[in-house]
Amino acid sequence: MENQDSLFETLNPPQRLLMGPGPINAYPRVHQAISQSLIGQYDPVMTGYMNQVQSLYRGVFATQNKQTFLVDGTARSGIEACLVSILKPGDKVLIPVIGRFGHLLCEIAQRVGAEIKTIDIEWGQVCPAERVEEEIKRFQPKLVATVQGDTSTTMNQPLKEIGEVCHRHGVLFYCDATASIAGNDLLVDEWHLDAVSAGLQKCLGGPSGSSPVTLSDRCAEVINRRKHVEAGIRAAHHEQGDDVMIQSNYFDLAMIMDYWGPERLNHHTEATSMLYAARECARIFLEEGATNVIARHKVAGDAMVAGLQAMGLTVFGDQSVRMNNVVGVYIPNEVNGDAVRGELLNRFGIEIGTSFGPLHGKIWRIGTMGYNARQECVLTTLAALEAILLKHGARVDAGQAVAAAMALYC
């Protein structure tokens, strides 16, 4: 039973350095943006901010897509909105599964009633475009859906070649870029991506609670064939789609496109503070410049790997296709992984991640993302981890990790 007195205490969460696979510490500017005054959803200032967010995220996604907007909710809300709006019961979807979050795409597609074909890849590897093309020819899907950066394995699925395959065969291409966006290259138009969803809480350096989404014209047309305007706001000039209604009201992207469109057709009340956060995340990314931000994430990730290897630890997976921003490292046999994580948190205030499924208890996942993709965060984490490992009797090479990581910053 919760202590009743604590219910009335002012929130005072401890200071943490969040070096796991997400969420991470938000940029200070994002905290400041969230604290700004609330205004009404149809206030001209608010609709102006919404227009700005659309323009800013076209820059983040490297796209000219008109339909670029936010879905209110965590990153999973954007994933679900895309899949339930594109797929109807009986539609065929091809899903390369490179980790835990590929299985999530399967789960959502199954709930829609889609016919699913998976390409199951060993965890720690990625799916070759040739495999995708082979299955497209055999299976003839409406949609290929994949995860770009799967934090469960730390792998970064190459998308350019798969996009070319999908474009060549006339298949829609969806990508969950939650963990990869802003820390790894993501070129929506150039790579022929038709639908992409993301989140703020990783390399974009914000809190969880808003999902940026972008849709190609072709994808938006497919979704709008299922358009339904609610009774009570429907007017004579509103046209209904001629296809099956989208099964979810809240995640109906046809409705959400109308809400973000010129008519501002009522659907939900925009999460004002999260819109402020999303706007600031995009401004920070574009001000620093995509090339610079991604390079910062790459050097931070490479420095973390260098430090871990200098300790004598082994990193997980194919390093040629690892995300810039998350590293998997095998837990030394002689230590209890959860005990090390717990002491790292309690003594140093540093959080690193465990893992899922077949990797649970075998690797830690260490993130260098957003505001935490900085030299001091990398060095502090390595020094603290080394100290705790030595205390727990791990056979590591002491005094090497920080110097190895620093060498990448010289």
Predicted segment positions?
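PLP-dependent enzyme catalytic core of the Aspartate aminotransferase-like
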Residues: 358, 362-410
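Active-site phosphate-binding strand-loop segment of PLP-dependent enzymes
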Residues: 126-182, 195, 203
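Conserved PLP-anchoring active-site segment centered on the Schiff-base-forming lysine
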Residues: 87-103
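Active-site C-terminal subdomain of aminotransferase-like
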Residues: 25-26, 201-306, 310, 410
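N-terminal "arm"/small-domain region of PLP-dependent enzymes with the aminotransferase-like
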Residues: 1-44
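Conserved N-terminal alpha-helix of the aminotransferase class I/II PLP-enzyme fold
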Residues: 33-81, 100, 104-108
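Conserved PLP-binding catalytic core of the aspartate aminotransferase-like
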Residues: 314-347
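Conserved active-site segment immediately N-terminal to the catalytic lysine
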Residues: 189-201, 211
